């Protein structure tokens, strides 16, 4: 049995969140699983996620394939209908330990996606670093209050909410203490 693998697609925020997902899945004892943290910013991003899911299903037929992220939040039915997918978890739910612990319980739900617009808090998690990366990313904000006609972000991430400044500073200090250097900000 092996620890869960996390395949991260999309933005830097997904990279940050993938570390929390990895910790939650490992703490829950999830084994032989591949978790796809997807992007929905373009139709191509969603297509590539579906393609990656099918490829991994062929390569690891016994693995549980779990889909989360913006594409899963925006269109959970599309992923639930894929025979290869074992479970679909929404963007808010992926950040909590409980869904990962209950995921494959005999009476557990296979689709855990709720109303992202009702979420008011941010991640509230500290990470030690980002696996396989020399640069770390931190969350300072999530979501968007604008509803531009061309943009799907609010529907995947919810309304705008900020991480309290003290938590941002504590996260930066932890990462610096773990060997990461302060770089320029990308917004």
Feature map (PLM): residue ranges:
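Proteins enriched for Cys/Gly/acidic motifs involved in redox and nucleic-acid/cofactor modification
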Residues: 1-184
